[in-house]
């Protein structure tokens, strides 16, 4: 595939790595020191973006956005933010929404509480990749 497919594959692989080694991943995202494995991840993203035709600044910016997306999404999964609500959590949400101050949120409660992490991850990644395609067209 093209550069978009290569970046998508890297993002999916990074997310999968987080699930295979959650303890190490959580340490990785909170540690400020550079490690060889971290540099390898950056190198892979930089390489694809550079070959795609992004200039230096956009290569770095795009890589940071993609990595931040994967890190934040995987963090949410590993800390139980990206999962369907339990019956108790749904009941608590319904109670908070009962006073009518948040009608749009209330109308979306069924969707909000029955998330599918894989679908949401692909959705966000597709948006980022579409934005990068647009940005590359401006270069």
Where are these regions (language model features)?
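A general structural signal for well-ordered secondary-structure junctions
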Residues: 24, 55, 72, 102-103
